């Protein structure tokens, strides 16, 4: 231990201390602070409390619920939709007696003809690479010819070597099932918490200030979720089908954050104290039940584990969990009597369906835009209720390249899809997404509360985003979702609030 605990005269440290040159004048001479004394700021007095509140209208799958926020505190900060999701089990009407339950067919079947996830469409994409004689070949020969055709396609399109069959466990093959589950099963779709919130709107004084959609909720978490703080269990996210099935068998409470502007930074918290004459409402539209579940066969019906009855739209329960901030009298009076403005971030959405591999979208966005976020979803994934799967053919990038035009002038030269999926998030976001989400940021730091760059699309007549998709996607229908995050100003006057700039 002597070698580890040997002493020192400290002369080396002193040598470093006096070794000063001309360049040190830029580093440490006339210092303005020290690392060896804590400097802090005093803050105003406050307290926080998280309060749950039921919706004012009925909650059900496929319905819109509305809530008027109670004036429990002076400010509103964090906000969650709390979903009480029932456990579900599968009952095969062809194999057992499912008392009091109608025949199946309500939910998509995983791996049937219409939902294989996109395997048939992938085969169509490589059809030009298949050797002659495929139709007359035996089933084994057909599989071999398909494999050879895929290898040619990979070499031609991606410069890739032959594909490998390297799935040897459940983690590598997420669709392999634990044998103990048997052949009859049902599960909630992945990330079901976020998917359930089809649309959430915040309404102040009868006017919608901002709207969030489930695709945006998923994309925003992928871009901003930080290590150790990913939502995973909060929203029902899993990585294998076995995990999804096992989780779905029990009742769960999910917490779905709503990333409105006032939840992102404390300085932008929504001041109820400034809204004596305006109410704040949250409207949440929930997804339809048949879009939320996947089953093992057409004859399967889904039962609520708590009641043993067929799952119904009104089996959904939800409330809103809101963090209220309480201020002392002086600061509360300041909010109540002062006229002021808050810089906020809104979200705009564009959606289109196409069967063309060359997509030209005219984006009718307004206001100074911080960034554009987009994704592509194949119809064959939608048929499987695989809603947040934005992958293309062979689980590759669906976007080959992208270009942006402002008034028919190129904003930047066409760049590969991977540049928008990897480099842009690396430069401007907290996280590089695990899936095929694409970003172009006009701001240096689009997650911050302070402006760091934008493009005022209200002053541009034509904004065109051109995407070159994989060639094979031109043979099927795909959905393209584009979201724009923009700045606006919320003005508070005489107990009322409204946007300074309308669309």
Where on the chain are the PLM-derived regions?
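Charged, low-complexity interaction regions
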Residues: 133-144
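Repeat-associated, polar segments at repeat-unit boundaries in modular proteins
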Residues: 142-165, 169-170
């Amino acid at each position: 231990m002597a070698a580890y605990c040997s002493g020192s005269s400290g002369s080396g440290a002193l040598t470093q201390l006096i070794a000063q040159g001309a360049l040190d004048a830029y580093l440490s001479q006339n210092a303005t602070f020290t690392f060896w004394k804590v400097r802090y700021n005093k803050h105003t007095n406050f307290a926080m409390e998280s309060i749950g509140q039921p919706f004012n209208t009925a909650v059900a799958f496929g319905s819109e619920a509305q809530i008027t926020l109670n004036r429990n505190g002076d400010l509103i900060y964090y906000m969650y939709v709390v979903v009480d999701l029932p456990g579900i089990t599968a009952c095969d009407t062809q194999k057992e007696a499912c008392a009091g339950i109608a025949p199946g067919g309500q939910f998509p079947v995983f791996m049937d003809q219409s939902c294989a996830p996109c395997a048939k469409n992938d085969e169509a994409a490589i059809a030009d690479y298949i050797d002659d004689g495929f139709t007359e070949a035996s089933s084994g020969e057909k599989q071999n010819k398909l494999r050879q055709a895929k290898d040619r396609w990979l070499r031609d399109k991606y410069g890739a070597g032959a594909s490998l069959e390297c799935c040897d466990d459940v983690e590598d093959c997420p669709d392999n099932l634990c044998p103990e589950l048997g052949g009859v099963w049902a599960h909630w779709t992945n990330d079901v918490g976020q998917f359930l919130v089809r649309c959430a709107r915040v309404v102040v004084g009868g006017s919608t200030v901002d709207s969030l959609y489930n695709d945006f909720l998923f994309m925003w978490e992928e871009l901003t979720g930080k290590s150790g703080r990913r939502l995973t269990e909060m929203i029902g996210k899993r990585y294998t089908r076995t995990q999804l099935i096992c989780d779905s068998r029990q009742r769960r409470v999910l917490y779905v954050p709503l990333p409105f502007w006032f939840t992102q930074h404390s300085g932008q918290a929504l001041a109820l104290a400034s809204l004596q004459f305006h109410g704040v409402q949250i409207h949440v539209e929930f997804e339809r039940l048949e879009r939320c579940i996947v089953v093992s066969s057409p004859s399967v019906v889904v039962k609520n584990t708590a009641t043993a009855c067929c799952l119904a739209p009104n089996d959904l329960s939800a409330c809103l969990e809101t963090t209220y901030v309480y201020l002392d009298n002086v600061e509360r009076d300041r909010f109540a009597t002062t006229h002021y403005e808050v810089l906020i971030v809104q979200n705009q959405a564009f959606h289109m369906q196409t069967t063309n591999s060359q997509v030209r979208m005219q984006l009718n966005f307004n206001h100074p835009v911080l960034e554009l976020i987009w994704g592509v979803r194949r119809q064959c994934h939608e048929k499987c209720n695989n809603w947040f799967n934005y992958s293309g053919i062979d689980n590759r990038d669906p976007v080959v390249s992208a270009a942006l035009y402002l008034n028919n002038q190129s904003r930047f030269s066409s760049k590969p899809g991977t540049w928008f999926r990897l480099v842009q998030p690396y430069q401007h976001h907290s996280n590089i997404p695990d899936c095929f989400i694409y970003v172009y940021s006009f701001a240096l730091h689009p997650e911050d509360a302070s402006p760091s760059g934008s493009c005022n699309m209200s002053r541009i007549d034509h904004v065109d985003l051109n995407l070159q998709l994989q060639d094979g996607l031109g043979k099927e229908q795909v959905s393209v979702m584009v979201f724009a995050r923009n700045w606006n100003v919320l003005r508070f006057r005489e107990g009322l609030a409204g946007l300074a700039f309308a669309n």
